[in-house]
Amino acid sequence: WYGSLTAAQLTGDRELENRLIRKFEPLLTTETNRISPEAHVDFRVFGVVPLEIYLLTRDPKYLELGLSFADRQWAKTTPDGITTEARYWIDDMFMITALQVQAYRATGEAKYINRAALTMTAYLDRLQQPNGLFYHAPDSPYFWGRGNGWVAAGMTELLRSLPEDHPQRARIMAGYHKMMAALLQYQGADGLWRQLIDHPESWPETSSTGMFAFAMVTGVKHGWLEADTYGAAARKAWLGLVQHLDSRANIDNVCEGTGKGHSVQYYLDRKRNTGDLHGQAPILWTASALLR
């Protein structure tokens, strides 16, 4: 939904933009029960959608709803100031960050970007490995493709909005650079990265590739990454991804929803879906990054 809204806005497709906003309306009125109240990062991240609609419409009802997700996430914190919803799974590096960054974009209030930066640095310290990639969790020492994609996309969204003089920007940028450099050596000849990034025998996975492409395109456009090297890698990824789209723009080879695993085989045996939203969204994010 977020990717569709940004793509519609960047292409000037007002009809699509309005249709997407209209589809949200029942969630404010007759279908409020479809919004989960559960205190879990995977449900909280939905708040990015009403916040994006607010940025497009300036209607305060969307701001109120979106901020309710961001503020409830910080209702309880650990002694170091991080939400107690943090699990130290790499997925969180997008789920938590994207919501708090979007709240900052909508309000300009520093507390939201500070939450995102604090969380990101804590996760970088705990999960990034010497090779630049990220374990799925401290007790799951595997470089899962989409999980690392969540990290790449989360850092990218944060760096897009994090003030240049923010005290944690240098640390986050260093983690981003280290990861981007690591990814270069694992990209397949087909342009895609693998289900387990460091296992070339594992299958090419599209949702991770879409997120890495998004991170690299954005990095090149903002001057964070060297254009010739990373632009070429991003282009190779994009051309590889479009080969996996069917006639209805459904992308295949998308890893199913995956909790942390405890063996290589667990990841290799995950089901590969077509049209799964985990894969559709990064295509839209990358398209949006190319248009910005």
What are these regions (language model features)?
Residues 40-99:
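Extracytoplasmic mature domains of secreted/periplasmic and thylakoid-lumen proteins
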